[in-house]
């Protein structure tokens, strides 16, 4: 019986050793699985956070673009209104007494450029005034000319138009930043 007991104890020891190894191995497998799971969770959280941050950046960029587009639209609308108002003022300025001096300067400046001028063209409403200012060449009526003068030479093949609206248009690009700044204030 002692041999049976000895064999039984030995078998029991072997079983306990195998169980202990299995327990250790299973704990190690579980720990590794938990580490991998935790690493995967952290990786996914980082990826989600990165996506969230990218989404925030995209949303901010889209909002900035929308805001800038709205500002640009408002600025363009304001600029259009300003230039429309200025053009109305230019039309009205032709009716004030000081316009005689303005038209005289416009004619003089255009004739400085076209030295061999044959005629001065003005709006029919300004023809009488132009005839008072120009005595050495013909004054013709041209309904297309508004608030200024066109001086022609060489049978109409050469000429220059010098109008208030034309001058405004030439400096419009230079004035745009200043007008925009004033509108923004």
From Swiss-Prot:
HAMAP family membership: ATP_synth_E_arch (MF_00311)
Pfam families: vATP-synt_E
Keywords of this entry: ATP synthesis, Hydrogen ion transport, Ion transport, Transport
GO MF annotations, alphabetized: ATP binding; proton-transporting ATP synthase activity, rotational mechanism; proton-transporting ATPase activity, rotational mechanism
InterPro entries linked to this entry: ATPase_E_C, ATPase_V1_Esu
Disulfide bonds: none
Taxonomic lineage from the root: Bacteria, Thermotogati, Deinococcota, Deinococci, Deinococcales
Organism annotation: Deinococcus deserti (strain DSM 17065 / CIP 109153 / LMG 22923 / VCD115)
Gene Ontology annotations for the cellular component aspect, listed alphabetically: proton-transporting two-sector ATPase complex, catalytic domain
Cross-referenced SUPFAM superfamilies: V-type ATPase subunit E-like (SSF160527)
Originating gene: atpE
Function recorded in the entry: Produces ATP from ADP in the presence of a proton gradient across the membrane.
Protein name in UniProt: V-type proton ATPase subunit E
Similarity annotation: Belongs to the V-ATPase E subunit family.
BP GO terms, sorted: proton motive force-driven plasma membrane ATP synthesis
Top-level taxon: Bacteria
């Amino acid at each position: 019986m002692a041999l049976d007991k000895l064999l039984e104890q030995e078998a029991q020891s072997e079983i306990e050793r195998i169980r202990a190894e299995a327990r250790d191995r299973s704990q190690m497998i579980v720990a590794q699985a938990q580490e991998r799971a935790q690493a995967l969770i952290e990786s996914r959280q980082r990826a989600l956070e990165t996506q969230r941050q990218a989404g925030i950046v995209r949303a901010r960029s889209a909002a900035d673009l929308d805001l800038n587009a709205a500002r640009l639209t408002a600025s363009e609308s304001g600029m259009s209104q300003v230039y429309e108002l200025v053009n109305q003022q230019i039309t009205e300025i032709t009716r004030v007494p000081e316009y005689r001096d303005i038209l005289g300067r416009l004619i003089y400046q255009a004739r400085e450029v076209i030295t061999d001028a044959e005629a001065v063209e003005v709006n029919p409403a300004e023809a009488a005034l132009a005839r008072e200012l120009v005595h050495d060449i013909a004054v013709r009526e041209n309904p297309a000319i508004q608030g200024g003068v066109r001086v022609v030479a060489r049978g109409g093949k050469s000429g220059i138009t010098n109008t208030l609206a034309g001058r405004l248009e030439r400096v419009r690009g230079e004035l745009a930043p200043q007008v925009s700044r004033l509108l923004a204030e």
